[in-house]
Amino acid sequence: MSVLFTILLMAVIGGFIGAMTNYIAIRMLFRPYKAIYLFNKRLPFTPGLIPKRRDELAEHIGKVVVSHLLTEDAIRARLLDENLQKEITDTITKMFHEKMKLETTPNELLHHFGYENAEIRSMAWIEKTLEKEINHFLSTKKTTKMSDLIPTMLESELTTKLPHVTERITSKMTLFVASEEGKIQIKQMLQKFFEEHGKMGSMARMFINIDSFSEKIQQEGLKLIGQEDTKNLINQLLTTEWKNFEAKELQELIPTEKQAHLAGQLTSELIQTLPHEKLFNQPIQVILRGYEAAITEKVIPFAVERMLDFVATHSAEIVERMDLAKLVETQIATFSLPEIEKLVVEISGRELKMITYLGGILGGFIGIIQGILAMWI
């Protein structure tokens, strides 16, 4: 009986020693957090292994993550994964539909991002920029001929339209001369003509009936306007004036001293044509509602695909600029030692307990062997 008790006692003692040895060894990975000194001498195994090698550990983990986990190829493959693309597209589409149920004006949106008085500030910026650009254009192009400023397509279009302008002028002239107003105007011109020529005019009026004479002039005027030579003359005059206009420099039409005033006027006119009140106060959803289907079916998938493709193409440069190894190292370095210990225990707690138990089992087994050997010796 004493032999069996001795063997069991040795097994219990060996198991306890083995378990405690492993438990202490595991604890010494983290504890103590700081070096302990006795008589100005640092005690061995202080601080613990992980606190002592913390910086080195963080550096190596960062290198391992970049070299074997977050590699350029792995990142590129993930970015080009169709499932990821679909997930991102679905998420953005869902967010877009949620936002479309709201009523958010550009003013409110800009206010949300800290841009106060958006409408006033934006219009002031547009007005200032527009006036500056017009002034710059007038100053830099003042010696340029109008023929060089007018686009070739517009110049050709205007040149081909001159005959139509001639037709319109003669048509308007015919309508006016043939009208009652035109007849009255001709009569008044005749009366004024006779009055301006004194006695000779008065004598002529004695032999001429103004009403019939004005009708005659009206008829002859209509014949003259309708003649092809008249149309050719008008067309020639228009062509000549157009050529003269093209030959002039910009400063001949707009003198330097009037440029600033003209720029201000043009800017004011252009600003007034902008529907800025509607633009800044109409809900964005109202503007986009007609394009909602196109945005969800085409724009969002295309934008996501292009974005992921761009990031994948430049993944090497992005990873290099981000310096992921340094990022991981820095993040690990920010963890406190209790946090690192807690993290490791949460991940490997079961395995660490098994190591402790294994130490107890091995210690107990060794104790049994020692007990048996002690009986034999």
UniProtKB/Swiss-Prot annotation:
InterPro entries, sorted: DUF445 (IPR007383), UCP032178 (IPR016991)
Cell compartments where the protein resides: Cell membrane
Pfam family, one: DUF445
Membrane topology type: Multi-pass membrane protein
Transmembrane segments annotated in the record for this chain: 1-21, 357-377
Coiled coil regions in record: none
GO CC annotations, alphabetized: plasma membrane
Primary site of residence: membrane
Record's keyword terms, sorted: Cell membrane, Membrane, Transmembrane, Transmembrane helix
Family: Belongs to the UPF0754 family.
Protein's recorded name: UPF0754 membrane protein lmo2224
Record organism: Listeria monocytogenes serovar 1/2a (strain ATCC BAA-679 / EGD-e)
